[in-house]
Amino acid sequence: MTKEIAVKEASNMLLQEPSTPSSQAVGLSSSPSSSIRKKKVNFSSELENSPGGNRPSFGLPKRGILKTSTPLSSIKQPNFQSFEGNESEKETSLQELQSSFCSGIENLQHVEKSARIETYSKLSSFLKIYTPSLPEDPIFPLLNQLCNFLLSDRCSNNSEGSPDFQLNTQANKLLSILLWHPTISSHIQPETATVFIEQSLNFLEGPKLTKALAAQHLHLLSCQKCPLSIHPLCNRILDVCFNISFPSLVIGQERLAVLTKILSQFPLEFSRRVVDWAPYLLACLVDASRPIREKALLLALDLSKHLYHDKLVARTILANFRSDIKGTAFVLIMTEQFEKLVIEEDDGVYVAHAWAAIISVLGGARISSWEYFNTWLKIIQLCFNSMNPLTKCAAQTSWIRLIHEFSLSETLTQATKRLTLLCQPISMVLGSRNLPTVKNAAMTTLIALIYACLRPGISDAMLSLLWDSVIVNILEKCALKNEVTIFESSNILLALFNTLSNGVWKDDRLVCRESVEAKELPKLNPVWVRANCSRTIEPVKTLLLLAKPDHTVKTTTPARKQHIRGLSYEQSSSVWSTYIKCLASAGQKEIKRSVETGRAICCICSSLHKFLYSKSIRKDELYVERVSRFALMVKSAIEAFGINTFVEASYLVSDNQLVLIDQTKAIDSYDHVPISPLIYLLHSLALLTNGTLFSTVHAAYSSILSSIEEYHLRFGLKLMLLWDCVSPLSDDGTLVLARVLVSHEVSRLTSEALLSELKSRNGNNSVEEGFSEEERSILLKLLSWNVKFCSISDAGSVNNLLQQYFTAIYKFEGCGSVFPFVVDPFTTILDDVLSFEANKVYSFAISLMKVSTFESCTKELPPVTLPENIRQHLDSYNHMVELYNTLLQRLSSSDQVDLQCRYLHELSEFIKKIPKEFIFHTICKLSKGLIPCFLMNAFPQLEKSTTLQKSCTNFCILILQLLLNSTATASNILESLSPLLTSGLKSISKEVVLAAIKFWNQVFGKFESEEYPIELQKTISYLSKTYIILLPFQSLCPGGKQANHQSSEKMSDILKGVDELRSVSKNGPYASSQDKGEKTTEFSGPGKPNNDNYIQIASVQELDDSSKGKAGKMPASKKNKRQKGDVKKIDETKNEATDMEESLTTPSGKVNKEVIVDDTSLRDEAIVPDKAIDVADNSNALLKENISSQSNRKADNNGTPSVNNSFTTANNDECSKENSQIEPEGQTASREGVLSTPRSTRKKRKLGRKSQSSNVNKEVAISEVSATLENVEVIERHGISEQGQNLDESACVLTNESSLSQTEIPEEKTENETTAVNGFENSKKRQFSSLLSGSIDTNNESNKVSSVEFDKSGPQDIIQSMTEATFEIEKNIQDLKSEEVQKLSDLLMRLQRAILSRIA
């Protein structure tokens, strides 16, 4: 058995009365062992056939009265066994029960004395456990007959004439049970009961009274429950008690029991005899016999119950205390005896309760003026200081009696002194090391003290005194800081702040046997709690810091009450929410927020701030847990007061504390900006953001901020609150993570608020109104802040906010407001943050592109009106495009290929949506950024990423295509975009160069102007050596005008011939697959054609070392330099115009032979000579044609596969429609051919060709021309179309690799160096280039050339002759006259037509 059980029994048994009749009372032991284990005597098994059932509600006697007796077998025994068994056996029918009871009574008439004794014993055992079935129980009619037998037998004599002790004893025992039984005694007639009591009094007053009989009859008087029969005999009973003089312990106990019974039945009559029983009671309280002391204690305790504040009793007791016994006051004698009991006998439990009984009898009025009160206090002081924990617990319980009598005070001064006295033993126990049982007993006393002080109608001054003296000094400073008592302390606070409590305060509650529980405490006045918020919140703050996780709280279960060690987070949250509701209830009826409520809000917010930043009191506390609890506490406060109270900006922050603004002063007089409580709390939480707590703070911040959306505030107020959340974080550079966190939540909630506002306005049938200027201003400020401080991962949330903002403006303001309210402000925002992280800016710029300005406006405005709408906001549009241009210029510096590709793709999609009237204007604004993209020499990752190559190529081709389809004229393009065109021609990307040449031929091929920039002319002139390009400008050709005029007629004839050839080609076996409706497969990347679908080009075998090259050899130094240049990479020369050949080289290192057909020439087919035909520069109009050797010609004749040279075109799926091309039958071998000559051999041949001089013999020249004519094959090309139209290409032919690698852009010649002959030769060169490109109509000349018969002589002879003639012409070209040169040109055109007709 634990000590807690012993404490409870020791404190409660003194308050219990004897519940069953007993010949000897059972009291408390003087030691813990005796109080824990008590002797109990049961009836003999021989006397009772059953051990008896459970104790009934009215009690059982603890010991049998009679000794064991042997049953007589000769006498018929009534069957009472069936009533003493289990519950099933007790369900005998009423008839059987009545017959059995009747048989027992009949036996009393006929049996002998010994049989009656046994019958009485059996009936006693039966009636003790029997519960009658009212109101028709079969026993009730037989009670009178049984009483008659008892009346005769309890006074019968034996044969010698003396009283028969055994029979009398059994009869008295049975009679005591009948009069004690709560149900049976009420069915005994009062007259019969009075006869029994008078008969007992006669025995007690008679001369033949013995000690045994006296004890039996006194026990009957103490057990009876017949008040109607006792009332006339009350004084007589008291006299008998006082006159019995047997020095017996049993008689002393029974006498005190009789006095206690009379006190409970007739307290007034008992109080009148106080003079008789008071000295006896006080003497028994200090008696040497423990049972006597305990019986006296029960009587004293009943005095406080039945004669509470009886003045006569109190005066008599005080008079007896003052009485002099041998020169010493009786009170001093009692004090001395009590000290001995505490110190020597360790019976402090009894002393404490006796001390409390006297206090209750005297009352508070007598105590305050009693001269021996301090002496009396020394007795309980010994109990408080005892080493016995049971004595300490009893002392705490007894102290409640003094609290009950001493707590009521008339003045504040008196109340202060009394509270100081009453709190001292409680704080002493709670503030020092003691056993948990002692501390729990002290907590019970504390609850009783609070209960006694919180009387109805208590004044505010008394309430403040109670709070400071009890709650602060004891509860907060002592009880809350111990894990044994903290849970009960939280229950006290819950009860005090619970506004829903409806408990009724009772004046005599502390006198009751049961202890007061915390839930019975009266609630505090909410108005007083709010007015004293700074004081009442302190214990709550302490409790919050001391709480622990729920799983760490330990629960112990002593005998009667469950004890919890520690305080859980859940319990602390309950205390906080209850306290907040108490504060809020004080202002429920307020129409406008009062000053008191405002101060309470300040107190709450400041306390939450301290809770968040206070140092940990518990060693095992995790700060993460505190952040989560902070969010729950804030939400409970908002729920209690309402969101409007927490969003009112009527507060200031001073020293990190929230202060209410004085309404009498102007807001401008304050240095700080007003702030709302919600923003103050959110800012306090955001300052904790770091790497460890980021996720926890993020979750807490999101939980609190969601209140803005939950309570359905108006849209403008939501925006203002969200702006207040972010504005304090702008100036502090150390709050990087806090900005990221807040940006994520604010951008999300702003988007949700906009979406909700859109839905609400759409659901409203009223006229839709736009946003106010203030709302738009706040939205833009929120966008600006989030763009500046959000993380890359949150850029999507900000982009969503921009999209929602655009939708709202477009919906309520119209399409015309998009540019001034969305595009221009957001562009300004991005301009301001260009110095920040590049990835974010590009993401936001892409989002701005996705705001479908043109597409959305088109839905509302017709296409004709759309350009006008843009013109109205041209400044905003230009501002946006200039931003894109700036980002495009910086794009090459990024090291993220995905970002570069994405930006180029999104910019392409944006440009496609622009009306064609603004394409030229937009490209002009983007020209500075487009130049690096066209050159492609500023992208470090270009060589490693085929994706980036493809993106850049597609982007550049799209720009050229859109510019071609725009409304801009050639002069406008030349004036504004010549640097861009020059960049395209100088690009390191082969596809971009080809697209630029195509664009040149289509736009400027026939456009003559004196304003061609020199750099453009130089670039075109340089490329004309490699490609067939129309050269309309004359800045490098001083004599070009006359030559052009002389050859204009011939050019028109050539153009006609080309048109005729086009018509023939379309119907030929190699017609373009575009006419067949086939699709084109997209290439895998720039410079790398797809293996499944590519353009088939005529291949040419490598020239033999003996037959290729021109006169002269390359110097050794130049040759070494060339060999070293072959080893260098692209990035070493990508910025020089002289390295254009590297961009035209395939990944395998082979030179592509490609053709671009001009719009005026072949649309579906193109013809390329064997090798690249190099047009002579401005000083030499010579045809430089590579011819293969005899061995190579022989290999070709034998069917050796030749090199496949592919032309790759970057496709743009968005701007063009692809058309497939299928190879005609018979050309598969040409497509699948491979290069049989090693690469090293080819390189040597190329170097050899370059090193040869221009003076070669006639035979070699004729053989080269013959080889050229013999190895020309057909070329199949893709067609590029947009909107159903084919994209035409200008024809161009590449030279071999060696000629490209060593060619440089010629420097501009002076006027002295430029002659009329050079200009004339330039004009002839352009004619010849046009002829090779197929731009000259050859329809009129087809018959002349086609009549040449190659079959009459051998092909070798014809080629040899032409080679000799060619070398002869080269040797004497300078001596020819202009007419002769003109004739030579005609011959060459005829030869070209013949070649073309043979190919077709």
From Swiss-Prot:
Principal location class: nucleus
Basic residues composition bias: residue spans: 1240-1249
Superkingdom classification of source: Eukaryota
Alphabetical GO biological process terms: telomere maintenance
Record keyword Nucleus present: yes
Keywords for the protein's UniProt record, in alphabetical order: Cell cycle, Chromosome, Nucleus, Telomere
Stretches for region Disordered: 1-63, 1065-1258
Molecular function terms from GO: chromatin-protein adaptor activity; G-quadruplex DNA binding
Biased composition range(s): Low complexity: 22-35
UniProt keyword Nucleus present: yes
Compositionally biased intervals (Polar residues): 42-52, 1065-1074, 1090-1099, 1177-1230
InterPro entries, A to Z: ARM-type_fold (IPR016024), Rif1_N (IPR022031)
Listed Pfam families: Rif1_N (PF12231)
Comp. bias regions, Basic and acidic residues: 1123-1137, 1151-1174
Gene Ontology terms: cellular component: chromatin; chromosome, telomeric repeat region; nucleolus; nucleus
Localization terms from the record: Nucleus; Chromosome, Telomere
UniProt similarity note: Belongs to the RIF1 family.
Assembly behavior: Recruited to telomeres by interaction with taz1. Does not interact with rap1, unlike the orthologous protein of budding yeast.
Reported function: Negatively regulates telomere length. Appears to play no role in transcriptional silencing of telomeric loci.
Protein name in UniProt: Telomere length regulator protein rif1
